[in-house]
Amino acid sequence: MFLSRKITKNARTIVQCQRFFQTSIFSQNAAPQSPIKVFMDTFRAELKKSQELQDSVKALQDSSGSLSESDTFKKARDAYEKARSGTTAASSFTGKTVGKAGAKIGSYAQKAWESAPVQLSKKVISSTANTVATGVDTATKPVRETAFYKTIKQTMSDGSTSSRYGFYADKEQRKKLREEFERRNRMFASSARIQPNEDVQSVVVHSNPSWKNKVEQIKNESRLVRKIQELKKSYQESEHPIVSSIRDMADSISGVWSRMFSETEASQVMRRFKEIDPSFNTEHFLQYLREYIVPEVTEAYVKGDKEVLKTWLSEAPFSVYETTTKEYAKHGVVSVGKILDIRGVDIMSQRLLQPNDIPVFIVTFRTQEVHMFKDASSGELVAGKDDRIQQCTYASVFTRVEDELDNPETRGWRIVDFARARAVDYF
């Protein structure tokens, strides 16, 4: 029984496999269709689907039209219109009621504010506040009158008059700022230099300690020391190729070593300025440049003020400027330009000028100027425009003369070179 069932199952499987292979062979042996025929069949099928869709939409529109014309739909629409009109009327009535209530409340509040009790309470509060303020002022008055408080008040700044990014003021304001700056910072050499006492003429010479005398005696009398000195002299003066090569190599190594650990040019410049004025400070000098020196010199340069320029400029740049102004004077014109703004005042580099190793600061800054020239006799404008603003870049070289530290105007600062590097129209 079991064996017969298994045979029947296997027979069915074989029959199914035969049918599958027959179908595959038939489908593979079928004639292929052309692309045009496939396209036409697909087009007809899509057209038929489109026609069926149009018929369905038309039927839906007909049913919608009949629905809108039915009695039930009309009753629902009338009920909606009545409900909306009722809501509008209720909201209008509510708005009017609230407005009337607000007006009444406002009038009551105004009457209450102007009533006698409230006015009395306002007077009491005001007098109490004045009493408290007066008490605080009286209590803090001894503190505010101390020297420490005044010093802190003068030192602190809110940054509104900061000259770090841009600064330009008229001549009177610059002088006031300069006086305040000198008093506050005490940066000038007159406060740090030790004046010589001409009344004292005697000189006290201190003798060397005894151990130094003994060292000098050993150097002069020791044979070993003399031998070492002779060998050193022979090494330095020898012309032997090997000794000369060794000496050159040693000199190059010592040169590299000295360059690695020697002073930079900037540090040498700072040391020289410190030797001239021990109280010198770079930040204070930059502030002094921005607030006084640069505006003073630049304004004189643009307006043609020779007296101010002669005070600050050295002989070479002043001669160049004077030659230029003489050409203007020959044509009977004078400069009446003006400075609008000064920005970017900064020390670009520090240098030692040869051959005397003069320490200098190279300072650059930008200005906004108006250049105009008028006739010296009639005062008529002959060149330039009042609304033509130019942005100019300046380069200047500053040094300090020790013999002029007591000059109340320059404090020893002198401009070695001053030139306008570039000028372009701002507008």
Swiss-Prot record:
**Which Gene Ontology terms of cellular component type are present?**
mitochondrial inner membrane; PAM complex, Tim23 associated import motor
What the entry lists under InterPro entries is as follows: NTF2-like_dom_sf (IPR032710), Tim44 (IPR017303), Tim44-like (IPR039544), Tim44-like_dom (IPR007379)
Q: Which Pfam families does the protein's record reference?
A: Tim44 (PF04280)
GO BP annotations of the record are: protein import into mitochondrial matrix
User: What GO molecular function annotations does the UniProt record carry, in alphabetical order?
Assistant: ATP binding; ATP hydrolysis activity; protein-folding chaperone binding
Binding of ATP occurs at 90-97
Q: Where in the cell is it found?
A: Mitochondrion inner membrane
Report how it sits in the membrane. Answer: Peripheral membrane protein
What keyword terms does UniProt attach to this protein? ATP-binding, Membrane, Mitochondrion, Mitochondrion inner membrane, Nucleotide-binding, Protein transport, Transit peptide, Translocation, Transport
Coarse class of the protein's main subcellular location: mitochondrion
Subunit (UniProt):
Heterodimer with pam18. Component of the PAM complex, at least composed of mtHsp70, mge1, tim44, pam16, pam17 and pam18. The complex interacts with the tim23 component of the PAM complex.
Q: What does this protein do?
A: Essential component of the PAM complex, a complex required for the translocation of transit peptide-containing proteins from the inner membrane into the mitochondrial matrix in an ATP-dependent manner. Recruits mitochondrial HSP70 and its co-chaperone (mge1) to drive protein translocation into the matrix using ATP as an energy source.
Q: What is stated as this protein's family in its record?
A: Belongs to the Tim44 family.
Query: What name goes with this protein?
Result: Mitochondrial import inner membrane translocase subunit tim44
